[in-house]
């Protein structure tokens, strides 16, 4: 039976735990560490997992160790648990869920030959609809990578990418839910401005985003094709699209994505 250690029981760590248990993993095979004793007890009571405060204890004989801590703590935690990982009877795989920390930095902080996987998650994994990209280190074999992918698939889709694409991936997936939340927020405000009750405007906007996303995913059609299907000549939708285009919506997204990628690259150099 696979044993999982989750170092850090924040939002991402809890989402992972929730997904694993929903996929019928035995909670007693999941160890979660927290700095806060209260938070640890909360997760234990909610999911029945093993709550620990010692990272090395959690990593002891764990098959996969997920690092769900802030980027600034990744190297510190790796240094803390590397001795334990060296003594495990089978090779453990370390999976970083933090932005900005390269595979090279992690491999240099651990013992030689440690299998390391770098993941860029996003927050929709909190509701089982995440998008996680995975990048394997030099010492990760095909079986280990497949195991990590299977575990991550419990909280959404998984895609393997090259590390050179991580900054672009951050802009397109890691941070993009926030862009869509902002667009939804603006659409709700527009509805209120038109006289709709806020609750009604929110329901309409959220349902429209959900439906549009499902159409793009399930029909296989290009977004431009689906948009054209809603845009009758000289109709209401065309009038709205014209205003958005003239307001520079495409350029705004280009610039936002570039700014995000640039910032990701900058953080990765620290």
UniProtKB/Swiss-Prot annotation:
Catalytic reaction equation(s): L-proline + NADP(+) = (S)-1-pyrroline-5-carboxylate + NADPH + 2 H(+); L-proline + NAD(+) = (S)-1-pyrroline-5-carboxylate + NADH + 2 H(+)
PROSITE patterns reported for this sequence: P5CR
Record InterPro entries: 6-PGluconate_DH-like_C_sf, NAD(P)-bd_dom_sf, P5C_Rdtase_cat_N, P5CR-like_CS, P5CR_dimer, Pyrroline-COOH_reductase
EC number: 1.5.1.2
Sample GO molecular function, one term: pyrroline-5-carboxylate reductase activity
Pathway in which this enzyme or protein is active: Amino-acid biosynthesis; L-proline biosynthesis; L-proline from L-glutamate 5-semialdehyde: step 1/1
Main function: Catalyzes the reduction of 1-pyrroline-5-carboxylate (PCA) to L-proline.
Stated name of the protein: Pyrroline-5-carboxylate reductase
Source taxonomy: Bacteria, Bacillati, Actinomycetota, Actinomycetes, Mycobacteriales
Chain's gene name: proC
């Amino acid at each position: 039976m696979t044993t999982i250690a989750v170092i850090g029981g924040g939002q991402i760590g809890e989402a992972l735990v929730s997904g694993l248990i929903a996929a019928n993993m035995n909670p007693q095979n999941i160890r979660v560490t927290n700095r806060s004793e209260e938070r640890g007890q909360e997760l234990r009571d909610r999911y029945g997992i093993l709550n620990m405060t010692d990272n090395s204890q959690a990593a002891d004989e764990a098959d996969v160790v997920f690092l769900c801590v802030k980027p600034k703590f990744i190297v510190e935690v790796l240094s803390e648990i590397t001795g334990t990982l060296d003594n495990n009877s089978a090779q453990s795989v370390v999976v970083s869920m933090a932005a900005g920390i390269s595979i090279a930095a992690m491999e240099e902080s651990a013992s030689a030959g440690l299998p390391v996987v770098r993941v860029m998650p996003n927050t929709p994994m909190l509701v089982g609809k995440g998008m996680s990209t995975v990048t394997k280190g030099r010492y990760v074999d095909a079986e280990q990578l497949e195991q990590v992918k299977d575990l991550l698939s419990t909280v959404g889709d998984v895609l393997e990418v090259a590390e050179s694409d991580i900054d672009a991936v951050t802009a397109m997936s890691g941070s993009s839910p926030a862009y869509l939340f902002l667009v939804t927020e603006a659409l709700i405000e527009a509805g209120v401005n038109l006289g709709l009750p806020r609750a009604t405007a929110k329901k309409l906007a959220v349902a429209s985003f959900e439906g549009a996303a499902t159409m793009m995913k399930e029909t296989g059609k290009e977004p431009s094709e689906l948009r054209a299907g809603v845009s009758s000549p000289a109709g209401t939708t065309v009038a709205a699209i014209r205003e958005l285009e003239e307001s520079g919506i495409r350029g705004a997204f280009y610039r936002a994505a570039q700014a995000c990628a640039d910032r990701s690259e900058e953080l990765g150099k620290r």
